[in-house]
């Protein structure tokens, strides 16, 4: 009824089990580290885009000083701002270079009334320019409630800069619940001084 057990076979079998366990633990640990590095890189990219979009919306807001009191946004200005954004992104050691940008401005018709009903968008001065495919989560035309009536007797113009970088499928799988690949976005809004 009893079987003879060879001591040498037990030692070999244990070593085989240890190697198999080591391989599983190694791959699980490597996968966990890959996820942590990806999450870190994703949020680092969002932080870079946030800083760049905030800087650019400040430039758009102050462009009357940069462009000789010209308050109307043009495609040439947007292309220059896009080049600046590309330069800022490269200087932040980002590997992505396929940056898309959308700049929106909203100006309001002159009125003496601070009533919200009298706040109307001036379509001759309100513009939206794209370089690449990039759409904000909320267009600036839906955020007009952020404008306030100034002491100078006018509604204050609004500016929005949205930056988009294409997301790798790895990011999309981790951070996107909708299933389709969406870019990493950052939007900044400013009011005129």
Where are these regions (language model features)?
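Alpha-helical assembly-interface signal, strongest on the long, hydrophobic N-terminal helix that forms
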Residues: 2-85
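Short, conserved structural patches
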Residues: 54, 62-193
């Amino acid at each position: 009824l009893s079987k003879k057990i060879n001591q040498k076979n037990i030692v070999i079998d244990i070593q085989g089990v240890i190697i198999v366990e080591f391989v599983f633990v190694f791959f699980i640990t490597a996968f966990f580290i890959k996820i942590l590095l990806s999450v870190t890189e994703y949020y680092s990219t969002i932080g870079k885009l946030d800083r760049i979009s905030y800087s650019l919306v400040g430039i758009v807001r102050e462009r009357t000083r940069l462009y000789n009191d010209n308050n109307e946004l043009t495609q040439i200005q947007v292309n220059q701002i896009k080049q600046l954004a590309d330069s800022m992104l490269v200087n932040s050691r980002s590997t992505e270079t396929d940056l898309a940008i959308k700049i929106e401005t909203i100006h309001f018709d002159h009125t003496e009334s601070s009533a919200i009903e009298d706040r109307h968008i001036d379509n001759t001065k309100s513009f939206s320019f794209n370089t690449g495919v990039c759409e904000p989560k909320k267009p600036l035309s839906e955020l007009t409630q952020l404008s306030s009536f100034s002491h100078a007797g006018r509604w204050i113009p609004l500016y929005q800069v949205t930056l988009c970088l294409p997301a790798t499928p790895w990011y999309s799988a981790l951070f996107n619940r909708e299933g389709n690949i969406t870019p990493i976005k950052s939007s900044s809004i400013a009011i005129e001084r």
